[in-house]
Design a protein with these regions (language model features):
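Short glycine/threonine-rich beta-strand-turn micro-motifs
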Residues: 127-132
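C-terminal extracytoplasmic interaction modules
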Residues: 106
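Short, surface-exposed basic-aromatic patches at helix termini and helix-loop junctions that form
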Residues: 147-153
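Terminal interaction module
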Residues: 1-50, 59-71, 75-103, 112-114, ...
Length: 193
């Protein structure tokens, strides 16, 4: 598995595989129930693994699964407009803002158990003193770290502090035609953003 974009965290106390597996097993993913908008928890990081942690060499792979219920706003608006037309036709009165909001909440409560589900996974890889999260989205990376901290009862970790952002540094390498340190440039590049 290749990570496409990475958010790194320096981990100061790496948990042991057995303890990590046991702790994440206690924070296992369950599907969103009833009126829940979403649910998240840890799951198998690979299709062939039956544990919460997949270990290889000196690395450990984990996965946080999130399922969100999706209710299109057009569907809610359509049902709300239907209800308002019925009230206006049957009772001969206009519907106020407060009553509209109550009707809207009732419609959402009725539709939520039947809503479509959007599923996603965020992967994390412990390697040495680092946790690499497979996302460039800071909020998703922090969410995985928060869930790890909740499951483990704490995990001292922080993002590395740099003098220059990695994207600006690598762009300069391309402009100069030469990389610094132990890096070297190849012939292909994909610029994003």
């Amino acid at each position: 598995m290749w990570f496409k974009q990475v958010t790194p965290f320096r981990v100061f106390e790496l948990p042991e595989k057995r303890y990590l597996d046991e702790s994440l097993g206690n924070s296992w993913f369950t599907e969103p129930q009833g009126l829940d908008w979403f649910s998240e928890g840890f799951t198998h990081p690979t299709a062939f693994s039956d544990t919460a942690v997949f270990g290889a060499e000196k690395t450990m792979l984990i996965a946080l699964k999130r399922e969100e219920k999706v209710l299109p706003s057009e569907a809610i608006k359509y049902k709300l407009d239907e209800q308002i037309i019925k009230i206006q036709a049957n009772e001969g009165r206009n519907v106020g803002r407060k009553e509209k909001q109550e009707l809207r909440e009732t419609i959402i409560d009725d539709l939520l158990p039947k809503a479509l589900i959007k599923s996603s996974r965020t992967y994390g890889l412990f390697a040495g003193e680092w946790l690499f999260v497979d996302t460039a989205n800071r909020r998703k990376a922090e969410n995985l770290l928060t869930k790890l901290r909740e499951a483990l009862g704490g995990l001292p970790a922080q993002q590395p502090l740099t003098r220059q952002s990695p994207s600006a540094l690598m762009t300069n390498w391309l402009l100069q035609g030469e990389a610094q340190g132990r890096f070297m440039l190849d012939f292909d590049v994909t610029l994003v953003g």
